[in-house]
Amino acid sequence: MSRFLSHLAELQPELFAEMSPELAVELKIGNGDYISIVSLRGAIQARALVSRRIRPLHLDGKIVHQIAMPFHFGSAGPVKGGSTNDLIPISGEPNVTIMEAKALTCNIVPGRLPRGPAFEDWLNKYVPKGGPANLHPEQPAEGAPCARAGGGHGLEGKIDNR
């Protein structure tokens, strides 16, 4: 499941974000419209897929919306575009060395991402609360646990904050 498989690239040529009809109405987004998704780690653009498969949650008297996005796409291959993994922090699961983080807080903005110098201003405007954005993958977010070289599996679940 990647953009390197030509038949899959032909069937799904662009990244999509599946959302509930309620969220689409709230944000004035139509099925197939371009949207921008922004998190504390970055921003990507995708096409909106409005679907009843995704439903809002009712938590503690509040409505919480969710979206679903495939994470098997990258920025290389015959079909290029945004990668969902650009939105999440780097957190490799040590046993199988794949990303363990598959949930995040984000904002959805109708329209395409701005290019050039306007991108940074746009990002700072729409980044979720808790910012500022941390666009350097090698730099952990402020307050995040940080493992140092020489630690690893031998710590048995303890975080090395030397």
Predicted features, each with a name:
Residues 2-162:
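Long, contiguous, secondary-structure-rich segments that constitute the structural scaffold
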